[in-house]
Amino acid sequence: MSAVLRHVLLLQRDVPAAAKFYRDGLGLVVNVCTERWAELGNAASATGATPDASGFAASAPETVIALKHVDSEAHRATGYSPILSFTVSDLDQTVNNLLRAGASLDGPILYPPRGKVAALRAPDGHMLGLFEPAEGTAAEAQV
């Protein structure tokens, strides 16, 4: 099975303000928005999703941008954002494939209850996030 692109992850200091910017500036539909996480999809006219009076989607569009809160300015520096995030069926095999292709791990593989998570740096410096859902959990869980 090939990897499935989940979203482009942008690290933010103020997630609600950033979601408002993308909604108002680009017409993206805000599917989820909390103080620490937001998901934005294609414009309502392109997906059939209908935004409510506040501009937030009543139905979930395909996610194209995810916003994640960070406190540290270092995490927002070049090389940490954006992060390409993928859902994979076999994280260990995918990590090995990427390491052989020239990537390097950026920290240990983590094993939270919802599945396995790994962060890697591609040879060109871009960050990749991998997520393998735990058996019986939804593949849509956040990295």
Per-segment meaning from a language model:
Residues 1-19, 82-84, 134-143:
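N-terminal beta-strand motif that seeds the catalytic metal site of vicinal oxygen chelate
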Residues 2-4, 76-81, 111-112:
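Short glycine-enriched loop/turn motifs at secondary-structure junctions
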Residues 16-25, 118, 127:
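Conserved active-site alpha-helix within GNAT-family acetyltransferase domains
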Residues 20-21, 92-97:
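Short amphipathic alpha-helices within nucleic acid-binding modules
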Residues 24-30, 102-104:
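Conserved acetyl-CoA-binding loop of GNAT-fold acetyltransferases
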Residues 29-78, 127-133:
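Conserved short beta-strand elements that form part of the metal-binding/catalytic scaffold
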Residues 39, 85, 117-119:
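Short hydrophobic/aromatic beta-strand element in the GNAT-like acyltransferase core
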Residues 95-143:
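Vicinal oxygen chelate
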